[in-house]
């Protein structure tokens, strides 16, 4: 399969990340202490796609590396559900290094190892699902494009994941680029249609949505307005950014955890180059959250 070259390149990136982290460890330690002492520690939300050893892709992490990630995260962070991460970042003060774990798409192999491993450790995660591949059994379009037709989850597996205590989230019906859709009806069909399918499977209520691809250009004001109107508790992007205490917390920024251990450690040990989000967004951040959504968020964290 034509994906070996990116993994060789990723090996060099891991080495470079380790070297840079080593060179800046003193600066990072001082910054960590200052943020903890000042109760200003940002919250990280990680996203994975597929945990498997066979057929590696740029959005796959090996079982061994996933275990290493979890070991290190458990030693250094509170690992909390997405709703609790949202609650903490809405508080003006946070002194506890905090991580939430999410998955995108819905790959069958996650039921072989990742989900059981999280369950064994009693760790929470939110599992965002693109529904049409689950219904049809067809591989995701980005896998077909890379000549690597990996199996999606089945409806029964999604139900099993939910029954195991993991939260299910929306990820559109067809894993489309929402930023390319200009008609409200098309955006509704992809976002709300996917959520309705998930809830019809008995895995709701669906509280969170993640944008496929997740870069700023893959989002839109139309979609954000629709999510607010539909009463969802928040949405996730995936372009690599922290979430700072005292924010509204409807937009949840995520960090890509698939690439490897050293890039993950470099991010989460406070790389000073990445502390602030300088991305131009095609939507206005909500300035306040409707009270009914805040009440729903309180109920989620109380469960």
PLM region descriptions:
Residues 2-102, 109, 180-303:
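C-terminal active-site subregion of NodB/CE4 polysaccharide deacetylases
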Residues 35-40, 74-76, 116-123, 153-169, ...:
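Acidic (Asp/Glu)-rich catalytic clusters
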Residues 46-51, 130-131, 170-173:
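Short loop/turn segments at strand-loop or loop-helix junctions that form parts
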Residues 55, 136-149, 175-184:
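Surface-exposed cleft-lining segments at the edges of enzyme active sites
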Residues 102-103, 169:
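Generic enzyme active-site microenvironment
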Residues 122-144:
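A short, conserved beta-to-alpha structural element at the edge of catalytic cores
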Residues 153-158, 162-187, 193, 201:
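Histidine/lysine/aspartate-rich catalytic loop segments that bind and position anionic ligands
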